[in-house]
Amino acid sequence: MAAKGGTVKPASGFSATEDAQTLRKAMKGLGTDEDAIISVLAPRNTSQRQEIRTAYKSTIGRDLMDDLKSELSGNFERVIVGMITPTVLYDVQELRRAMKGSGTDEGCLIEILASRTPEELRCINQTYQLQYGRSLEDVIRSDTSFMFQRVLVSLSAGGRDEGNFLDDALMRQDAQDLYEAGEKKWGTDEVKFLTVLCSRNRNHLLHVFDEYKRISQKDIEQGIKSETSGSFEDALLAIVKCMRNKSAYFAERLYKSMKGLGTDDNTLIRVMVSRAEIDMMDIRESFKRLYGKSLYSFIKGDTSGDYRKVLLILCGGDD
């Protein structure tokens, strides 16, 4: 199935200077014209939004991020600020938020580290160090423990094989190792799961999953669920899901953020902002297929006001 890509594309007939003037006008004097802010920023892609920030500073002599933060509030502010933050920096800030203060947002750590490409992860590491003067690995080590810590450290290194090569003998060995690591009567050899799932390329892993099913008569997901627990289990399952179908993984993240009472706004905002340009069309398709309703209708029913307006534009339409 061919990937459909993102909902946010570069706007044509784009003028950063004109957009900067429109934004200033929307925030000047009493009150704020939220609709004008949405109409400028939502249809632009990330690099165009960066050009607008530069134009705003050079033509108006003020910082766009500061102005938006002082004029807006709540979840709407968080979406807009996320949209004008460079992509890698946005991930870095989310990782930082997930480990700051008491408590850890394990779901956020898993989502970012399991879904980003090795190249993206290397950029995240460099930016984290520059931004906060500490390595991402250090912070993960001080904030997590045991096998969960080890899987995050392993993922964050961005060392996954990026090729497509399939070594048949190694593939069979990996499947056998995972089977034995889990089916051993005296407990689970978690390191084997970690080694295979964090370092092998996607093509290799998809074959490993098939071979594992052939020898164990169950899906790798079932094996992971019966042999591991807690955040370590969540991380391994996320890796498997991202390898099988990344857009379905994000569809599930969005569904879980909105189903039932209350909304997990952190997850909803992060996925909508970070995937709009990459694979939002594919996420929408997966969402409809998995849950029988459109992502658009879920967002519409779960949010309100300007927050809803901007998320629906990022969503890009109903299905």
Swiss-Prot record:
<dbReference type="InterPro" id="IPR002391">
    <property type="entry name" value="ANX4"/>
</dbReference>
<dbReference type="GO" id="GO:0001786">
    <property type="term" value="F:phosphatidylserine binding"/>
</dbReference>
<dbReference type="GO" id="GO:0005737">
    <property type="term" value="C:cytoplasm"/>
</dbReference>
<dbReference type="InterPro" id="IPR001464">
    <property type="entry name" value="Annexin"/>
</dbReference>
<keyword id="KW-0472">Membrane</keyword>
<dbReference type="GO" id="GO:0005544">
    <property type="term" value="F:calcium-dependent phospholipid binding"/>
</dbReference>
<dbReference type="GO" id="GO:0005886">
    <property type="term" value="C:plasma membrane"/>
</dbReference>
<dbReference type="InterPro" id="IPR037104">
    <property type="entry name" value="Annexin_sf"/>
</dbReference>
<dbReference type="GO" id="GO:0005509">
    <property type="term" value="F:calcium ion binding"/>
</dbReference>
<dbReference type="GO" id="GO:0042589">
    <property type="term" value="C:zymogen granule membrane"/>
</dbReference>
<feature type="modified residue" description="N-acetylalanine">
    <location>
        <position position="2"/>
    </location>
</feature>
<feature type="repeat" description="Annexin 2">
    <location>
        <begin position="86"/>
        <end position="157"/>
    </location>
</feature>
<keyword id="KW-0968">Cytoplasmic vesicle</keyword>
<dbReference type="Pfam" id="PF00191">
    <property type="entry name" value="Annexin"/>
</dbReference>
<comment type="function">
    <text>Calcium/phospholipid-binding protein which promotes membrane fusion and is involved in exocytosis.</text>
</comment>
<comment type="similarity">
    <text>Belongs to the annexin family.</text>
</comment>
<dbReference type="InterPro" id="IPR018502">
    <property type="entry name" value="Annexin_repeat"/>
</dbReference>
<keyword id="KW-0597">Phosphoprotein</keyword>
<keyword id="KW-0111">Calcium/phospholipid-binding</keyword>
<dbReference type="GO" id="GO:0005634">
    <property type="term" value="C:nucleus"/>
</dbReference>
<feature type="modified residue" description="Phosphoserine">
    <location>
        <position position="12"/>
    </location>
</feature>
<keyword id="KW-0007">Acetylation</keyword>
<feature type="repeat" description="Annexin 1">
    <location>
        <begin position="14"/>
        <end position="85"/>
    </location>
</feature>
<feature type="modified residue" description="Phosphothreonine">
    <location>
        <position position="7"/>
    </location>
</feature>
<keyword id="KW-0106">Calcium</keyword>
<keyword id="KW-0041">Annexin</keyword>
<protein>
    <recommendedName>
        <fullName>Annexin A4</fullName>
    </recommendedName>
</protein>
<feature type="modified residue" description="N6-acetyllysine">
    <location>
        <position position="300"/>
    </location>
</feature>
<feature type="modified residue" description="N6-acetyllysine">
    <location>
        <position position="213"/>
    </location>
</feature>
<dbReference type="InterPro" id="IPR018252">
    <property type="entry name" value="Annexin_repeat_CS"/>
</dbReference>
<dbReference type="GO" id="GO:0012506">
    <property type="term" value="C:vesicle membrane"/>
</dbReference>
<feature type="modified residue" description="N6-acetyllysine">
    <location>
        <position position="293"/>
    </location>
</feature>
<feature type="repeat" description="Annexin 4">
    <location>
        <begin position="245"/>
        <end position="316"/>
    </location>
</feature>
<keyword id="KW-0677">Repeat</keyword>
<feature type="repeat" description="Annexin 3">
    <location>
        <begin position="169"/>
        <end position="241"/>
    </location>
</feature>
